[in-house]
Amino acid sequence: YYTYLELDQDQNGMLCAAELAKYGEGGLTMPFVARVFQECNTFCSPASQQLEMDYKSYLEFVLAMRYTQRPEALVYFFRLLDLNGRGVLGAFEVNYFFRAVLERLIELDGEPAPCQLEDVKDEIFDMVKPAQPHGITLADLVDCKVGHTVVGILTDANAFLAYDRREFNMHEPE
């Protein structure tokens, strides 16, 4: 509850997209946050005419973020990532969300990430090993056992950096 209060900078009891974007370490991308507000239960503020999230919707978001390995969380995220509601994440969706991660990395670090969009898209498809090569279904995402990693790569610049630096971090002395 304290995190919710800290995020609620205008202290109106609701969170707007800009406030929610500061969740965690501030690595969430705006296209992902926009999808949260498009797909989850939100309210239109009469004063600002923008969508805002109440505490109940925030709790659903937090539970999904904290327990990304759970199938229920993957259902939550899949709904957000599936832009057209087709039940498939194709190259377009992967590129759309990862492009935003690359942009967020520039905002945070001031320099581009040392990777190519196509390489990461191919790596995600290799990780998931979808039953059909044209796209990733919810079942593929759950069954692959790395769905949480894929969600992080597509939604959060900090999660992508952690994934990208995983081998380096494994060899760091403590």
What name fits each language-model region?
Residues 1-12, 32-63, 73-85, 112-140:
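Primarily EF-hand calcium-binding motifs
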Residues 14-30, 52-66, 89-108, 136-150:
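Amphipathic regulatory helices of Ca2+-sensor modules
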Residues 19, 70-77, 93, 106-113, ...:
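Structured alpha-helical bundle/scaffold domains in large eukaryotic membrane-trafficking regulators
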Residues 24, 40, 78, 98, ...:
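Solvent-exposed, non-transmembrane amphipathic alpha-helical segments
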Residues 46, 84, 104, 167-168:
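Alpha-helix boundary/capping detector
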